[in-house]
């Protein structure tokens, strides 16, 4: 947590969860009970300075925050914005520099950085044992704080619980200031001095305040990393809970489930013989089933009704009632019942005026104290109308005037509410059933169909297949879809939709998960950070009464595509220029990204490089070429930029392809314009030329999605003219459809087509069976951004490396553009302090990581890989801060690795890494594990490579454990 440092006296508030203003203002510490909390603006940053800055750093920044003097800490005037200044003095207090300054310092003045009088505090944590922390509690100084006290007091928390990373960072972020003209600058998306620390990363809500996970006896607080080794449910873990006994509640389907506080309430449904109207309850804390107390008249037995929670009440609307055993009195309802949780009472609402028609299998949601009813089945037809009821006003229904791209009439679909919108996915729609996701924005009352085409959004997996009787819930920034009937199958995979990136993915469950069987007409609800599923129908119409729990995770989002896309748009550090089309339009890019994604363009770049080499040798002579090339590679302008000509390419199409190269997305504007169809045809041709099959596949998907009656003839004409058979066939297939043919033929553009095309359309219409769509391209949809960058890092990018990263005796070739796109540390270095020999010494704070750990970091930077052994995690959890990554996603996975992956097989590596990084709590845990499994650990080859000191510590730990064992034996013997 960000501990308080205020006034001229350094107060060491090290009590866990203790009080104190948050560093950077705006926050008070949590209670002293051990439950951590951070409140205030949500984001804060500190500008630290000292007048006694080493010459190397002062020459870089040319600025010191605060006035010289006592070296105390001084609150900024604008404290309500969450800013804090720490004024420097003659005493070397904590010094906070921007990534560029630190990069320069590490490269230019290593001796000064290592001096005890010039301790830089850029993103450093002091990893001391809990005993040492207790010894420092009483430490305070008057007038100045030395670097040791700074480290003890100011702990920059990058901690983010994997299940609770929802802080939005409400306040503005401060930045350490530099005067005009300083070489160290920060712009929107640049590096430089803007350093914001997420003070709400452990918050339980987006307000920037809340309570984090309480420190338990089995958990360890490693300053910037809180690791919990107590037993708990792993993320993405399916767990089978206690089944509901028959005497409590029958096995059922077509029921509803709602969550209220720490319980799940189940109402209605049918057991295969009778409809039900009982109300049963499952408590998630005591993990037990029981009947809920209820007074008043409950709703009649029913199924396919809806249930929502508003305030402290549950509302039941509509559904299908009657006697299914005798097949009598079967009817749909439009009644509304309220169940008040606090008084356990049923109340029926009465209405005057217009009401929704009776219905079942509809959707219901609550937003803005209103209940919203959508679609369903009225006994004769499916519906798509919408009604709303103010739950705090008069008992009056209002029909909603829906705008936008409305879904087709449907029933047996789920709804979920998130971000001022209601989401509807698939459902029964007869011939119109699709796997489309629709969004209804409550404030504008407008529908929007969300594109399912994965390549358009950069998705790595397809959306769920069309289905009905499934469930969908919202948690964090995701929608989760489970079960249902999908074309006569009952899948049990869990699909996830990311509301930020707008892509679908399939959740891979944790090993040893008890995954529920596929089912239909079940029900689900979210309680805290888990989804609970109850009941449903499985094979052969068998009703179930089982309950399953799925543990969510809330990792910070992967910013790989966003980082690369922004880097392309900013046009920083471009090292190649494409001259495109007859007009010779010049488009800047980066060699590394282009070479990674296209073999054709990679060969063009190598050929252009060879031609440039020969030209330079002609002009300057062989002896001068190497020096000029080095200057050009280092970012200087003394060497010519590489040029590649693409005379036959469309500049607009090529720019879109470049954006795809960086982001894996096809980003088109004005998507309903006729020119878009021509443009996508040009992109398809270039994708084939550049050997990018996934992009070509995306173009076909896009055409299927966007072709309509107004532009299909234009697309057909261009495909025929360009001899692109697959696009031509897709256009033909669209034209000859019964619902499209008449409108297309009667359009004015139809008569303008060439005679051979007209004849072909008529013949295809008369003999549609002869139209065969080539689907061979679907077997090879190419590689994703991650796969290409992985191959580029490991093999194909060796010829394009332009920077050397030195880690002790190891030289690791890399690519400046990739490093700069992801790390503000490297961005600032390459902009202002580029090493003349293209060599960068690697450290993370004061620690040199292991070679394996740094390779794990490179894999994360290049293609977002988060798998790592725990010993690598110990080195890397400071990396997001030190290197200026976009968020603390890597940090969260370091935490995950430490909590899940320490075993007797890697415990010695973990012990060694924790000793080097001085994370003594992890070291203590590793020693305990070694003692526990000493017979296995002692036979590992790694033990022979440990230092003498670590071997002695292991021997002492084993001896101590034997001493405790003998003591227990003596006590038992005496008794």
From Swiss-Prot:
PANTHER family referenced in this protein's UniProt entry, alphabetically: LEUCINE-ZIPPER-LIKE TRANSCRIPTIONAL REGULATOR 1
Key word Repeat present: yes
Subunit structure: Component of some BCR (BTB-CUL3-RBX1) E3 ubiquitin-protein ligase complex.
Role played: Inhibitor of Ras signaling. Acts as a substrate-specific adapter of a BCR (BTB-CUL3-RBX1) E3 ubiquitin-protein ligase complex that mediates ubiquitination of Ras. Together with Nf1, plays an important role for normal sleep behavior, mainly during the night. Might affect sleep by modulating GABA signaling in Rdl-expressing neurons. Might play a role in the regulation of brain glycogen metabolism and organismal levels of triglycerides.
Low complexity composition-biased segments: 174-186
Keyword Cytoplasm among UniProt keywords: no
Origin superkingdom: Eukaryota
Region (Disordered): 16-41, 158-186
Family per record: Belongs to the LZTR1 family.
Cellular component terms per the entry's GO annotation: Golgi apparatus
Intervals holding Kelch repeats: 263-312, 314-369, 370-417, 421-467, 478-524, 530-581
Tissue: Expressed in Rdl-expressing neurons of the mushroom body, the neurons projecting to the LC9 optic glomerulus and in a neuronal cluster near the subesophageal ganglion (at protein level).
Pathway linked to the protein: Protein modification; protein ubiquitination
UniProt keyword annotations, A-Z: Kelch repeat, Repeat, Ubl conjugation pathway
Biased composition (Gly residues): 16-32
Phenotypic consequence of gene deletion: Flies are viable but most wings show wing vein defects characterized by extra veins and vein tissue, which are caused by an increase of Ras-MAPK signaling. Decreases sleep with night-time sleep-fragmentation patterns, primarily during the second part of the night. RNAi-mediated knockdown in neurons of males results in reduced total sleep in combination with decreased locomotor activity, increased Ras-MAPK signaling and altered metabolism including reduced glycogen levels and increased levels of triglycerides.
Name of the protein in question: Leucine-zipper-like transcriptional regulator 1 homolog
Span of domain BTB: 574-670, 801-870
InterPro entries from the UniProt entry: BTB/POZ_dom (IPR000210), Kelch-typ_b-propeller (IPR015915), LZTR1/Attractin (IPR051568), SKP1/BTB/POZ_sf (IPR011333)
GO BP term, pick one: sleep
